[in-house]
Amino acid sequence: MPKPIALSRNPSTPLFQWRAYYEMTKPKVVALMLLTVLVGMCLAVPGVVPIVPLIAGMAGIGMMAGSAAAFNHLIDRRIDGLMARTYNRPLPKGRVSIAKALTFSCSLGILGFVVLYVLVNPLTAWLTFASLIGYAVVYTAYLKRATPQNIVVGGLAGAMPPLLGWTAVTGEFHGNALLLVIIIFAWTPPHFWALAIHRRVEYAKVDIPMLPVTHGVEFTKTCIFLYTILLAIACLLPVLVGMCGPVYLVSSTLLSVTFIYKAWQLKFHEEPGMAMKLFKFSIYHLMLLFIALLVDHYLWL
């Protein structure tokens, strides 16, 4: 009986190399980010999004986001190798060399910038470049190691995608787009602090001053709870300015109440693994919130 053919796991094979580069772009994170870009595009126009800024904008922003993620892998390669969550990443494991990782990161970023500049508009290209620098350099290379408020200050770069989507279609700033930025900005600290509680021993081992390491777990739980309340208020802003209708209002209220309740449980009635459960819920919260924005927008056209 013939033996089944097994896929090669030789690091030198093209398939294995491709998977390593793909992993460096943090595809799941970029996918969630692109959802917020798409919502920003759709809310910027009353009807259908023009095809060129839609495709070129999503592609260019996606490439530059992947480039920022790859730079994050490159800069954090030493501490990644010491943490259980990240030790198996391509650079710590030697699946990609430093030189190749740098070449890949730069090439992907440059290609994304050119696509945005030529096919979309210069404003979106430069704003996306600023976001890349904010995440890869300001946050990863400096803030992450400098202050327990790293997530709060550095979160602005990660909150930009809806604005990028908006400018890709309109070519200009708009206050409504900034409201979407505020939502993600308020969402970021409780999202990452929940993970930091779960991984606080590892962060302490590599001298990363995450809030649970520097100020303790109980203080961090309090901050998470307060930020979920702040997030709930931020989520109401699109309704208050007339951007959204009842579908979004009901959806965001249910999501906010659930997030606050789970943060309350973490603070006052913690069970084993509660921080990680909150972290995972926060991902669904953001995803469902922006889907609700999209549904509400087109439902009332």
From Swiss-Prot:
Principal EC category: transferase
The keyword Transmembrane is annotated on this UniProt entry: yes
Pfam families (alphabetical): UbiA
Catalyzed reaction equations: heme b + (2E,6E)-farnesyl diphosphate + H2O = Fe(II)-heme o + diphosphate
Pathway recorded for this protein: Porphyrin-containing compound metabolism; heme O biosynthesis; heme O from protoheme: step 1/1
UniProt topology in membrane: Multi-pass membrane protein
Xref: InterPro entries: Protohaem_IX_farnesylTrfase, UbiA_prenyltransferase, UbiA_prenylTrfase_CS, UbiA_sf
Domain of life per record: Bacteria
Cellular component terms per the entry's GO annotation: plasma membrane
Membrane-spanning residues: 29-49, 51-71, 96-118, 123-143, 151-171, 177-197, 223-243, 244-264, 281-301
EC number: 2.5.1.141
Compartment(s) of residence: Cell inner membrane
GO MF terms, alphabetically ordered: protoheme IX farnesyltransferase activity
Keyword Chaperone attributed: no
Keywords: Cell inner membrane, Cell membrane, Heme biosynthesis, Membrane, Transferase, Transmembrane, Transmembrane helix
GO biological process: heme O biosynthetic process
Function: Converts heme B (protoheme IX) to heme O by substitution of the vinyl group on carbon 2 of heme B porphyrin ring with a hydroxyethyl farnesyl side group.
Family, per entry: Belongs to the UbiA prenyltransferase family. Protoheme IX farnesyltransferase subfamily.
Additional comment: Carbon 2 of the heme B porphyrin ring is defined according to the Fischer nomenclature.
Record HAMAP family: CyoE_CtaB (MF_00154)
Name of the protein this chain belongs to: Protoheme IX farnesyltransferase
Source species of the chain: Shewanella halifaxensis (strain HAW-EB4)
Organism placement in taxonomy: Bacteria, Pseudomonadati, Pseudomonadota, Gammaproteobacteria, Alteromonadales
